[in-house]
């Protein structure tokens, strides 16, 4: 029968992290619970939605936790309800005691709340990933890669493989990550400091975004383990499992052009602000596009909406080379791409009005390239 006391705020923080893997509307009702596992070493909180699973460990040795364990065991509690109850408790310290099979009493200050739980044996087992040699990355670096690519993945389930980000390690240290929804593409390449085993996996972009939320910047490094259809991201106290997407990712290398007819370098902030103004009106037009005109070295953006009005704006540039061009595209794609850049300047290169154009950072030597497909207009 479980019995422990703990700092309420730290416990609540750990519960909220674990809850990111828990869906209250799951087809499997037991997955709307959080599993609380108490051992001599500490407390493990477990949550899963079938796609991702999070194990969050609070160590007996963690001084901030003020953890005092009197007796061991495990129990399932309805996650959202339990977290709401814990957050409402008045005192800094929380006492958690199982009084009879799967029934607990929470005591804090003068408040005492009794809750019914469920037998932890009902909870599905998380498939263990056998201990192999992990790939070790800086957490900040992995989160940066995710920020630069995951936004370009598809949100449509019609082609499930495109809802993921393709991670490929070749020659033991050359990492390439790509995401595309077939209208836009984002690709980041880098050379790792240490050699690792090659891999080729597609990780759901939704799982990667959750990873970024769960692994805060104070976690310096993350260990990455691969198994048949799963990947595990692990730090000292958090294990984050996600299923991989099955199938072959399309060959995106052939989509990337190398020869261009027009090249422009912009200030990222200026261009983004221009596009955000243009989008205010383009969202009211039938095709939602903005027209970019390059003529005699001058670049301007145009939107015309019969219902709302029009935008004509000359955009400052640092450099314009090549042929004149008029091209239409979805401004949201360009805004998203600019948000993913960590540079002050961007170079955009065009072939023609109907061929995809590329964006690369102009003032860093990062191997980071984005591609946007234009929209054909009359």
UniProtKB/Swiss-Prot annotation:
Q: Which InterPro entries match?
A: DNA_clamp_sf (IPR046938), DNA_polIII_beta (IPR001001), DNA_polIII_beta_C (IPR022635), DNA_polIII_beta_cen (IPR022637), DNA_polIII_beta_N (IPR022634)
What is an annotated GO biological process for this record, any one? DNA strand elongation involved in DNA replication
Q: Disulfide bonds, which pairs?
A: none
A GO cellular component annotated for this chain's UniProt record is: cytoplasm
Q: Which domain of life is it from?
A: Bacteria
Function as written in the Swiss-Prot or TrEMBL entry: Confers DNA tethering and processivity to DNA polymerases and other proteins. Acts as a clamp, forming a ring around DNA (a reaction catalyzed by the clamp-loading complex) which diffuses in an ATP-independent manner freely and bidirectionally along dsDNA. Initially characterized for its ability to contact the catalytic subunit of DNA polymerase III (Pol III), a complex, multichain enzyme responsible for most of the replicative synthesis in bacteria; Pol III exhibits 3'-5' exonuclease proofreading activity.
This chain's protein is named: Beta sliding clamp
